[in-house]
Design a protein with these regions (language model features):
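Acetyl-CoA-dependent GNAT
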Residues: 4-10, 15-85, 96-98, 102, ...
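Active-site acidic-Proline motif in GNAT/NAT acetyltransferases
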Residues: 83-85, 89, 117-118
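Short coil/turn segments at alpha/beta junctions that flank glycine-rich nucleotide-binding fingerprints
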Residues: 89, 106-109
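Conserved active-site alpha-helix within GNAT-family acetyltransferase domains
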Residues: 93, 118-135
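C-terminal "cap" of GNAT-fold acetyltransferases
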Residues: 109-112, 116-120, 132, 139-158
Length: 158
């Protein structure tokens, strides 16, 4: 279900973010074209992050990324975003179940993530998976228009 991101995925990645205004506004101030996403994907692939598409029957339905800290036995979820027409179909849960299995194989014992304090739907979803809030933080001027207020959450896998 999780497939690594590659350079040819720019068009679909762009469409996912255009469907999800909350994420789009964080990453961009104006309309971005596929060429901008091609540039971003190159940065993502060079970065320490690990990026996957969530695939169902050969169709990409979302994007899941995380940062790896194997020496500390930890991973931090970067982004989970599901394309609008595939919301509420269980794809986020399936992606996390596969992700947790990968963590166990890699001896990862703690998973962290951050979530917008106003995103009750996501907070409840993460709580159902077993995550707990352990801190709050403000990212000043996340983009030019607002500060990002978020909860830090964690899940112990052992």
């Amino acid at each position: 279900m999780l497939r690594p991101l590659n350079k040819s995925d720019a068009e679909f990645l762009c469409s996912i973010f255009k469907d999800n205004e909350e994420y789009y506004n964080i990453f961009f101030d104006s309309e971005s074209e596929v060429s901008e996403w091609e540039r971003r994907i190159e940065i993502f692939l060079k970065n320490n992050g690990i990026h996957h598409f969530i695939i169902e029957e050969e169709v990409p339905v979302g994007w899941f990324s995380y940062l790896d800290c194997p020496d500390q036995g930890e991973r931090e979820v970067g982004i989970l975003v599901i394309k609008k027409e595939f919301l509420y179909c269980g794809y986020g849960r399936k992606a996390f179940i596969e992700f947790f299995e990968m963590c166990k194989v890699d001896n990862i014992h703690t998973v962290f993530l951050s979530v917008n304090k106003d995103n009750d739907r996501a907070i409840n979803f993460y709580k159902k998976l077993g995550f707990e809030i352990y801190a709050e933080e403000t990212i000043p001027q996340c983009n030019e228009t607002f500060n990002l207020e978020q909860y830090k959450m964690k899940l112990n896998l052992v």
